[in-house]
């Protein structure tokens, strides 16, 4: 242990002295000779040998003889089981199944593998022999009062030949007699369940309550919940020491692992798995394993892409001993004692990849061979030899070098209007921040025709005749052509756009919903479990004592009035302003906003921060009777222009700045990447006629607003993001903005018989992005370019966001 600490400490000191000098300004993300650069400067340098498996592996199990490993893969595309030969280190079977979500366990002799059926509300029973899986049977967990179960964790009870399953929709524990195919007992611990394990004496079962920040202790003698034990937020995977004295559980929302004394049923220690003890949340520890003698605990930090190692030989005195770099979003880790190796399931794989087979609107296709960004990320299994002290030191140095906030240097900036780093003072010149969130456009779709930017005009769908205000704004102010949405779809998009983070619940459940495998859209205040512990930008504003006004973000509707979906939003949400509803024009939203704005101005009570939702650029496709695609885009564009004009002609203009983003890019066409998107910054202190090629992300926007308002960073992502400073000037230009009236009819309706009209009728447009995006983009393309048009093949790097 002392050797580990000395080596690691020395390497950290060296890194601190040299890293700033070695950082290079690399313009674009992608794979280099030595690492993969992600959009915000984080790097991937995965250790060991890496084997391709299915999409988004969620769990990992291996046989006692260490010949085989099996992963459950629960991505947006195919759900599957991957069987890996650990002698040859190859995937030997990929069994596609209808639905699965995490749960895996063997029976006593490993002849049967039990697999969670997710929202099918069943457990699959597969025979397993010589590395091959075959479906044998299934166990139906539904009872008369269950509408939806959603099976998550599983464990086998050898003494009774029972199966214990837990769920995240019915929030229940199911004890099942396998031989009799009979549900013996159903227990209700009170919140969403993630994992279930038995102690070694088979006296108790323990269930991590994902949404409850507790562990449920189940007495296996009377099959009752004996007590609930408090731990950290979003408890996920658990381990119990061989002597049944300590339970370890990862807290995904807290950068931590809770250690529970099972004799006293109390948390006695909390281990911080982040690289630095004082950094914000965002590491997302979600899986753990022991080494052979249980002296070392290994923790998989999903959003940091590394394993954290701790010496736990002395209870209550755990010590960090190093880190191991792994792949993208590690979701499971296991230790092979016979081989002294580690197995790591990487949810997003290893590298960004090209997307030459992206959707080609204009061609008839079943989409089976197309690549969609939500299913481009093939998982991998890393096989890593357990490192000695020297190797662990080298790995640790690599992890530190991969991490921007450790190597953070003060941004170079000539301007003095916005602080360059987080402090509590904020900007002395800018007092009012307006944040406008729109829906789902790529850079090339809207601005690809602007010659001074890095655009592809052949991919531009909405030229200046449709989006005259967008074009005028980026010509008058600054054009940003290297901005990337942190998110994939609206589920995580509205979280990344407001929290610089999407919780592990959001990341692990949106592929289920968007893959058509059940679930509900509950990521905008619909369920408490979806919220990050670090909160949202409005929490920071309110906690700072600043005023805030919310228009349409995270709201729910009742009898024509809109209220905040979260308690803290209720008093600051304008009840007349609609949320996401494509039947309501953005022109109406502008009218409602303007009435409130003018009233606030008249009272000299304009809030420091306003969040305004403008969703019409999502469009309704070619649904008969709905506004045409161009009409909805133009409606959105004009509303944006009118908002900018109204602010610029107010007495608050000199002290104002406006940020405009798309929550995600909807997998649209873009010659750089499907996540490159439209971002605008507007105000007197924004440079005019300037082009900023700096790489920015959604988290960059949040960080810049934090710097202006004197707020603290919410997560590691806004902490390490590049602030938008290159386009800021000390010399204000108070010229106001005149909006450009639409050049097309905003009331134009889709006629019958348009390409995709019938499919648009069938699509769920009541919920953000609850449509098959490949098909929806094809409809958009043909509606604009013509029914016979064909999008030429493009290459798109397929990174999802900053680090994941």
Role assignments for model-derived ranges:
Residues 4-12:
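Sec-dependent N-terminal signal peptides
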Residues 7, 44, 134, 374, ...:
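A generic structural signal for short, non-catalytic loop/turn and secondary-structure boundary residues
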Residues 12, 17-418:
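Predominantly soluble domains enriched in secretory-pathway, periplasmic, or organellar proteins
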Residues 393-804:
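N-terminal pro-sequences and low-complexity stem/linker regions of secreted or lumenal proteins
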């Amino acid at each position: 242990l002392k050797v580990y600490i000395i080596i690691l400490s020395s390497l950290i000191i060296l890194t601190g002295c040299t890293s700033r000098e070695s950082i290079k300004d690399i313009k674009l993300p992608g794979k280099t000779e030595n690492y993969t650069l992600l959009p915000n400067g984080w790097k991937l340098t995965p250790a060991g040998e890496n084997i391709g498996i299915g999409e988004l592996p969620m769990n990992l199990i291996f046989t006692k003889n260490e010949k085989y490993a099996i992963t459950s893969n629960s991505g947006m595309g195919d759900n599957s089981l991957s069987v890996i030969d650990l002698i040859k280190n190859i995937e030997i079977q990929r069994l596609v199944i209808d639905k699965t979500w995490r749960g895996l366990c063997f029976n006593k002799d490993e002849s049967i593998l039990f697999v969670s059926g997710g929202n099918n509300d069943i457990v699959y029973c597969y025979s397993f022999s010589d590395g091959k899986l075959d479906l044998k049977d299934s166990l139906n967990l539904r009872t008369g009062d269950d509408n939806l179960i959603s099976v998550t964790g599983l464990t086998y009870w050898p003494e009774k030949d029972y199966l214990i399953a837990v769920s995240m929709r019915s929030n229940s524990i199911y004890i099942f007699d396998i031989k009799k195919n009979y549900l013996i007992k159903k227990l209700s611990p009170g919140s969403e369940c993630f994992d279930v394990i038995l102690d070694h004496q088979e006296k108790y079962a323990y269930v991590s309550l994902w949404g409850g920040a507790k562990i449920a202790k189940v007495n296996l003698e009377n099959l009752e919940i004996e007590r609930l034990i408090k731990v950290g937020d979003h408890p996920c995977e658990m381990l119990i020491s061989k002597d049944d004295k300590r339970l370890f559980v990862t807290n995904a929302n807290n950068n931590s692992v809770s250690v529970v004394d099972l004799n006293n049923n109390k948390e006695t220690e909390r281990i911080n798995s982040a690289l630095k003890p004082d950094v914000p949340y965002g590491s997302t520890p979600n899986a753990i394993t022991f080494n052979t003698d249980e002296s070392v605990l290994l923790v998989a930090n999903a959003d940091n892409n590394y394993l954290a190692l701790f010496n736990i030989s002395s209870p209550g005195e755990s010590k960090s001993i190093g880190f191991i770099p792994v792949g993208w979003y590690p979701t499971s880790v296991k230790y092979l004692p016979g081989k002294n190796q580690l197995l790591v399931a990487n949810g997003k794989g290893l590298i960004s990849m090209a997307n030459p087979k992206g959707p080609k609107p204009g061609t008839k296709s079943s989409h089976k061979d197309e690549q969609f960004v939500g299913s481009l990320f093939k998982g991998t299994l890393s096989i890593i030899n357990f490192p000695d002290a020297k190797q662990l030191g080298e790995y640790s140095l690599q992890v530190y070098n991969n991490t921007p906030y450790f190597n953070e240097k003060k941004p170079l900036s000539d301007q003095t209007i916005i602080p360059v780093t987080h402090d509590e003072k904020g900007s002395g010149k800018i007092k009012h921040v307006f944040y406008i969130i729109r829906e789902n456009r790529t850079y090339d779709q809207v601005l690809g025709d602007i010659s001074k930017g890095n655009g592809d005009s052949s991919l531009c769908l909405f030229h200046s005749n449709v989006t005259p205000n967008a074009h005028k704004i980026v010509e008058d102010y600054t054009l940003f052509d290297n901005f990337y949405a942190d998110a994939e779809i609206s589920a995580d998009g509205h979280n990344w756009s407001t929290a610089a983070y999407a919780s592990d619940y959001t990341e692990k459940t949106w592929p289920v919903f968007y893959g058509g495998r059940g679930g509900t859209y509950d990521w905008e205040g619909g369920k408490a479990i979806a919220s990050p512990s670090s909160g949202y930008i409005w929490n920071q504003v309110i906690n700072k004592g600043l005023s805030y006004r919310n228009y349409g973000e995270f709201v729910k509707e009742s009898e024509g009035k809109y209220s905040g979906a979260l308690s803290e939003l209720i008093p600051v949400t304008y009840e007349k302003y609609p949320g996401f509803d494509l039947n309501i024009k953005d022109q109406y939203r502008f009218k409602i906003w303007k009435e409130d704005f003018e009233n606030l101005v008249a009272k000299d009570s304009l809030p420091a921060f306003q969040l305004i939702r403008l969703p019409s650029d999502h469009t309704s496709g070619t649904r008969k009777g709905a506004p045409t695609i161009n009409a909805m885009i133009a409606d959105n564009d004009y509303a944006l222009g009118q908002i900018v004009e109204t602010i610029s002609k107010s007495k608050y203009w000199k002290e104002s700045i406006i940020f405009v983003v798309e929550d995600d890019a909807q997998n649209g066409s873009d010659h750089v990447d499907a996540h490159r998107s439209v971002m605008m910054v507007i105000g007197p202190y924004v440079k005019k006629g300037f082009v900023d090629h700096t790489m920015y992300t959604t988290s960059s926007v949040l960080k810049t607003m934090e710097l202006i308002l004197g707020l603290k960073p919410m997560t590691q992502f806004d902490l390490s993001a590049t602030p938008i400073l290159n386009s800021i000037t000390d010399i204000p230009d108070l010229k106001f903005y005149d909006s450009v009236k639409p050049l097309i009819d905003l009331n134009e309706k889709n006629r019958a018989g348009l390409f995709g009209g019938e499919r648009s009728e069938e699509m769920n447009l009541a919920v953000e992005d609850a449509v098959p995006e490949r098909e929806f983009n094809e409809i958009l393309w043909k509606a604009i370019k013509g029914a016979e048009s064909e999008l030429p093949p493009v290459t798109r790097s397929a990174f999802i966001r900053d680090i994941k």
